[in-house]
Amino acid sequence: MAKSRNEPGNIELPGFSDTLQLTPKIDKPHYAGHRDRLKQRFRDTPDALADYELLEMLLFRAIRRADTKPLAKALLMRFGSIAEVLAAPEKLIAEVPGAGPTVAHELKLVEAVAKRSARSTVMEREVLGSWNKVIEYCTAAMAYETREQFRILFLDKKNKLIADEVQQTGTVDHTPVYPREVVKRALELSATAIILVHNHPSGDPTPSRADIDMTKQLVNAAKALNITVHDHVIVGKHGHASFRGLGLI
């Protein structure tokens, strides 16, 4: 059926027999301008952005047509900080309302890139001369894990890092460590020194009695085969503890 000339959206101009069709103006969604402004603020002063704003921007790729601010705030409310959001298990991230598998996968990808970047700053370097970088890497890799991990940094005779391996993963407050296996692996890699690292999911890096006893056993087992244990570092959300710094090695 032909559209009436008197219907809304049609305009008749004097001297013209045809009717002009006007296309209604479509407003951009409110979040479109917000995203542009947030990106510009990031370019100008990235350090001035709040944690939830940085997380908003991380979510842009996974959520292309919606406001990401509510989800960013919900994730921080659920897990506590950006670091804890990224370290959270993928399944738990996906369970946050508005997240789902795509968001969870995207955030775990960001975490993997961050860990790889931190690791690249210590590989093939003289580790003892780059100690702050080592601590930064271990903190990024382990401090926010929900279960204890026991990691070993294997060094050559020049104290360069030749391998970085997670030896064991345990429970929330315990990781089984077998000195014989640690020493065996060091010999396989021709390592002449090692640095022991594990995390405390509680956040408190204070060594336990069990940590101290296990370290003594490991030091003795390594010493028998001329392998030096430079340090045992415990990392947590609230800092780190060095056995050598505490006089425990």
Swiss-Prot record:
One of its GO terms (biological process) is proteolysis. The keyword Protease applies. CDD domains: MPN_DUF2466 (cd08071). One of its GO terms (molecular function) is metal ion binding. Residues 127-249 form the MPN domain. Keywords: Hydrolase, Metal-binding, Metalloprotease, Protease, Zinc. This is UPF0758 protein Oant_1909. It comes from Brucella anthropi (strain ATCC 49188 / DSM 6882 / CCUG 24695 / JCM 21032 / LMG 3331 / NBRC 15819 / NCTC 12168 / Alc 37) (Ochrobactrum anthropi). The lineage of its organism: Bacteria, Pseudomonadati, Pseudomonadota, Alphaproteobacteria, Hyphomicrobiales.
